[in-house]
């Protein structure tokens, strides 16, 4: 399924308790994440998504896609793939819409059940990350400070989520699913707290599209 990474979409307040025991670099990473989830209410930017294959040193890029995103906490966002195909995941705070342009098909599902312990809960949800995740200190790689998030629920799609910051900016996420597959998301051109129009997340079903409700 092409939108597997964020579907079924489809936050780290308690992590502050780790600061005293964590190394300085990790304290900085925790501070940056805490700042992101509490102070960034809206944002827009670009992303590149890489599906990886193999393990460890043998990890190689299997496929690459890219696009744009915009969000307004909590639960309003538009995640748009533009290459190599067009696809849209959009939520208005209540309902998540997944639109496949090639199939001219829209899937609707209730947003509350779609976020949960997914990467979307970090990017687009409330700032109560400790409700859904446990936190483990990660390494600093190429100047990017990492934290590892493990979903508290055992039946989630992802078994581990890494999130990296540099200079207060969200740089990347590494997602490992229950089957051992790894996906890397890198972010660029991020604008923090832009003013967004009132109808920015209103979804209109494309003409002639089939609609499936889940």
UniProtKB/Swiss-Prot annotation:
One GO-annotated biological process of the protein: lipoprotein localization to outer membrane
Chief localization: periplasm
Alphabetized UniProt keyword annotations: Chaperone, Periplasm, Protein transport, Signal, Transport
Signal peptide: 1-27
Gene3D superfamilies assigned to the protein according to its UniProt record, in alphabetical order: Lipoprotein localisation LolA/LolB/LppX
A single cellular component GO annotation: periplasmic space
One Pfam family this sequence matches: LolA
Domain of life: Bacteria
Xref: InterPro entries: LolA/LolB/LppX, OM_lipoprot_carrier_LolA-like, OM_lipoprot_carrier_LolA_Pbac
Compartment annotation: Periplasm
SUPFAM superfamilies associated with the record: Prokaryotic lipoproteins and lipoprotein localization factors
Subunit structure: Monomer.
Family: Belongs to the LolA family.
NCBIfam families: lolA, PRK00031.1-3
Function: Participates in the translocation of lipoproteins from the inner membrane to the outer membrane. Only forms a complex with a lipoprotein if the residue after the N-terminal Cys is not an aspartate (The Asp acts as a targeting signal to indicate that the lipoprotein should stay in the inner membrane).
Name under which the protein is recorded: Outer-membrane lipoprotein carrier protein
Organism of this sequence: Cupriavidus metallidurans (strain ATCC 43123 / DSM 2839 / NBRC 102507 / CH34)
């Amino acid at each position: 399924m092409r939108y597997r990474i964020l579907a079924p979409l489809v936050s780290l307040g308690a992590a502050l308790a780790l600061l005293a025991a964590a190394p300085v670099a990790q304290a900085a990473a925790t501070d940056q994440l805490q700042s992101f989830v509490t102070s960034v209410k809206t944002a827009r930017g670009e992303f590149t998504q890489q599906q990886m294959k193999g393990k460890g040193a043998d990890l190689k890029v299997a496929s690459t896609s890219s696009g744009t995103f915009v969000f307004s906490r909590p639960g309003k966002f538009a995640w748009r793939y533009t290459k190599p195909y067009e696809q849209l995941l959009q939520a208005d705070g209540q309902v998540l819409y997944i639109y496949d342009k090639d199939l001219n098909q829209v899937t609707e599902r209730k947003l509350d059940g779609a976020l949960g312990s997914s990467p979307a809960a970090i990017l687009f949800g409330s700032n109560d990350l400790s409700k859904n995740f446990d936190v483990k200190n990660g390494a600093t790689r190429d100047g990017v400070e990492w934290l590892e998030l493990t979903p508290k629920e055992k039946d989630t799609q992802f078994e581990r989520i890494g999130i990296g910051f540099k200079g207060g900016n969200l740089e990347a996420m590494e997602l490992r699913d229950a089957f051992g597959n790894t996906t890397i998301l890198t972010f660029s051109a991020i604008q923090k707290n832009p003013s967004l129009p009132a109808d920015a997340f209103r979804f209109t079903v494309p003409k002639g599209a089939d609609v499936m409700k889940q």
